Every structure is written in structure tokens, then in C-alpha cells.
Amino acid sequence: GADRVLVLDNSQIGPIFGRGVGQALAEAVRGANPYAVLFASTADGRDLASRLAARLELGLTGDAIDLEIDAEERLVQLKPALGGNVIAPILSKTLPNLVTLRPGLLTPATPEPGATATVDQLPAAPFDGRDVRLLKEEFQEDQVGLVLANAPVVLGVGMGFGGVENLAKIQEIARSIGASIAITRDVAHAGW
């Protein structure tokens, strides 16, 4: 488990990972000098990892599917290549290693009884230069189904489904069997 946890309260910065969060994380990484910094391959994780890599002038391996330690105790990052037909081993030329990992890839470690971690607060201040800002925030409360990663059943909708007029049917079926609905990129771009 973790021996030390760094917490960044971004309530003063805002809900998105802009330069203020990147700056605070970069200062923490410089101070701690870790061997590796791992991020989830989510929109926020990729954004923050790339900001950190740029600020610290480090390499970044994106969307790794596994990690190994080789005989020389180097972190080997395994990444799909050539359309997923090959798994390429990546060795960083810079330290710390920065890696984004696909969500759900790692199995949580079994906690050690009685183990504790120190919790340190990272200072955060709004970035005083130009930054990303949130223009509009919307919440959709009537979503049907479960998060795809946790869904026991997923119904897929592609362009062959016919059109937006047929979506009510698939939503009804999904509700009746407790399924989530996934759509292809073409369907999303069509605005169904």
C-alpha cells in the first residue's frame, strides 16, 4: 500500500485540471523525486499527465496495458502498437517514469493490517496566467444503465441500427434486462 498520500484540494482552483493543478503536482513531484508517477488513462488523467510531462520535460507513456520490472530493475511499460497486434515494451529515458494506465488494469493490493500512511496537503493557488476555464457545466440525471466497465450486459448500437427513431426501442430493452447501452463513434458523431 501507500506510505504517503498527497492531497490537493482544488476547490480554490476549479473543477478542471488546468495549469494550477499541473503546477502544484509538478512542484510535489520535484520535491518527492519518485521513481514513477501513474495516472489513469481517462480524459483527466491524460490531461494532467501531459501537463506534468511538459512542465518537467519528461517522457510520457500513454495508455499502457501492463507494467513489469526487468532484471535491471527498470520499469517496463507495455503498450499496444500496430493496431493492437503487437505489445511494445517501453523504457523511459527520463525519470521519474510517467505512465497513463487503462482503468481497471491493476488489482488492488491487500491492505497490510495496522499499516498507516501519512497524509500531506499540497498547497494550491490559482494559476495567475491564461488557463483553461469551465464555460458551462451540465448534469444529466436521467441516464439509463450502468457504467460500461461494471455492466453485466451491454447492448451495442451502430449505424446499422437504422436511426435515432429506433433508440427508444433499445432503451426499453436495456431497462427491461438491466443493461447499459454503448454506441459506436459514428453514432455519436451523428448525434443520435
Please place each PLM-identified region on the residue numbering.
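N-terminal glycine-rich FAD/FM-binding segment characteristic of electron-transfer flavoproteins
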Residues: 1-192
